[in-house]
Amino acid sequence: MAWSITNKADTSSFTKMAEIRAHLRNSAENKDKNDDIFPEDVIIPSTKPKTKRATTPRKPAATKRSTKKDKEKEEVEEEEVVIEEYHQTTEENSPPPSSSPGVGNIVESVTAVELDDSNGDDDNDNDNDDNEPMVQVEAGKVNHSARSDLSDLKVATDNIVKDLKKIITRISAVSTVLEDVQAAGISRQFTSMTKSITTLSDLVTEGKSKVVRKKVKTCKK
């Protein structure tokens, strides 16, 4: 898009403003896009490379499948273990079972019901399934009461042991203080006794106590 205006003598130059305007209009309409120094349509690629974030694979959540039979077996095993522990603790720390028939009768009734349910006929399976929740509830109550009794007894014994330890530490502290006081008193009595013995020996040997004359220092003028 180069053009110039020359003198009027030159016939090849533009002589009218209309011709100049027409020439500028044609040049503006027919100009090439590559002639622009800063074209608008050119996309400048970015120099920074695109980085993809590393995706950590997610672990599938483990699904636990528990059947009704497995749950019932686990509950029965837990009940048997608790009943055995309760029998051991009652035999060691409580009077004979004749003095406390209530708990023994309940435990025996629960075990008898469980045995009856386990030895039932095939025709009465549905009835046994209906009665099992009631038996489990009763056994759970007995187990809960036994556990609560054992926990209360343990808490009481722990408190008694702590109190006894505190009393022992206080008694030992008092005994050490008394020993120190007695030792100090004995040492004082011993020193006073030695002084009296020395004065007695002086009186026996010389008949009177020694008189020590102190020399008086005179100041020289």
UniProtKB/Swiss-Prot annotation:
Keyword Transcription regulation: yes
Swiss-Prot/TrEMBL induction comment: Constitutively expressed in abundance during viral replication.
Keyword set, alphabetical order: Elongation factor, Host cytoplasm, Phosphoprotein, Protein biosynthesis, Transcription, Transcription regulation, Virion
Chain intervals with Basic and acidic residues compositional bias: 25-36
Family annotation (InterPro entries): Pox_Ag35
Cellular compartments per GO CC: host cell cytoplasm; viral envelope
Residue list for modification Phosphothreonine: 89-90
Sequence segments annotated as region (Disordered): 25-105
Location in or out of the cell: Virion; Host cytoplasm
Oligomeric form and interacting partners: Interacts with the DNA polymerase processivity factor A20. Interacts with B1R kinase. Interacts with the late transcription factors VLTF-1 and VLTF-3. Interacts with the late transcription elongation factor G2. Interacts with itself. Might be part of a transcription complex composed at least of G2, A18, and H5.
Protein name, UniProt field: Late transcription elongation factor OPG110
Organism of origin: Variola virus (isolate Human/India/Ind3/1967) (VARV)
Gene that encodes the chain: OPG110
